[in-house]
């Protein structure tokens, strides 16, 4: 069986793909796994396991930001599972030293303060100005998804992204 696998951005969850999943699930198999808090290796194993459970032999992988990092990890582990990829706002190379320092600093702040500050810190760079100005429902959904994340999962993911 063939389908689509949606891979969410940091620090979101599969809820970010609800509209896309709802649109496609009547036409083909769709997965949107949750992996916040896992290393990329563990996340790839989880995705492949969910694909196996669903009987999904191959897929088009859609990765946004951190989801794109995971697409590359999946391709290293199981290239035969790929029909194609859609990558957005991601990169194939490692973080710069400055980016790594910023991730570790953000990790420390999350562990100290929780996730309450993250929407204001991240949404300006995650959503375009037009979306922020004209689509309050999108902004609110993104804010809510971020606030649902556990500080521990966010902190662990920041380490995974830095390494």
Please report, for each region that a protein language model flagged, where it lies by residue.
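Conserved donor sugar-nucleotide recognition element shared by glycan-biosynthetic enzymes
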Residues: 40-47, 68, 99, 115
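Gly/Ala-rich beta-loop-alpha elbow adjacent to hydrolase catalytic centers
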Residues: 63-67, 71
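Short beta-strand immediately N-terminal to the catalytic nucleophile in serine-hydrolase-like folds
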Residues: 61-63, 88
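Conserved alpha/beta-hydrolase catalytic His-Asp/Glu region
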Residues: 95-99, 113-163
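Flexible "cap/lid" loop of the alpha/beta hydrolase fold
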Residues: 72, 76-120, 126
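Conserved HGGG/HGGXW glycine-rich cap/lid loop of the alpha/beta-hydrolase fold
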Residues: 1-41, 50
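Conserved acidic catalytic loop of the alpha/beta-hydrolase fold
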Residues: 41-59
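Active-site acidic short loop of glycosyltransferases
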Residues: 1, 26, 55-58, 79-80
